[in-house]
């Protein structure tokens, strides 16, 4: 099973909402705690914000957006061997039991928010009184004879949210190839 799942849902107007998918309990049974938070990082992807309507005269603005985190903190797994950098739009962190493992972490200059999210790209603030550290982002494991991977970002491979590289898709293709053979 390959999960693309949010701990916190972000709608098209950049308004965060509680995730309503009802899969938190199932993930716990698999040994993965999907946290109800959002990970931010100083290692942020450049994102274009602004007018998407051609009739508007405002030009889009491209800026680093802390809620779209870039990382190359990977476990030594074959599914990551040809991947150089991954981008996670509005990702939550995961905690794993001993039976599960962490495939990908955020960069060490990262932190989490659990409430009072301000997703506006114009008001990205540096963390204050927050410990920066790497946070687990992708978990994998087995359950019985089955295998699973949890990617805590439902937009991880959606067209409008892909990074400038194909590495997000490359990871997914590698995972599918490994888990179906």
Language model regions located:
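Acidic, S/T/G-rich, low-cysteine, solvent-exposed domains in lumenal/extracellular/periplasmic regions
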Residues: 1-180
């Amino acid at each position: 099973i390959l999960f693309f799942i949010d701990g916190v849902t972000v709608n098209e107007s950049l308004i965060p909402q509680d995730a309503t998918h009802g899969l938190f309990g199932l993930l716990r049974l698999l040994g993965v705690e999907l946290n109800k938070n959002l990970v931010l990082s100083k290692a942020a992807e450049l994102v274009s914000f602004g007018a998407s309507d051609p009739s508007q005269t405002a030009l889009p603005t491209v800026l680093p957006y802390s809620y779209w985190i870039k990382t190359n903190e990977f476990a030594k797994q074959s599914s990551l061997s040809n991947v150089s950098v991954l981008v996670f739009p509005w990702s939550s962190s995961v905690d794993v039991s001993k039976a599960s493992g962490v495939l990908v972490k955020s960069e060490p200059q990262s932190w989490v928010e659990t409430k009072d999210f301000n997703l506006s790209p114009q008001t990205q603030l540096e963390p204050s009184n927050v410990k920066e550290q790497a946070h687990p982002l992708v978990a994998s494991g087995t359950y019985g004879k089955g295998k699973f991977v949890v990617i805590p970002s439902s937009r991880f491979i959606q067209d409008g949210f892909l990074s400038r590289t194909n590495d997000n898709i490359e990871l997914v293709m590698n995972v599918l190839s490994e888990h179906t053979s």
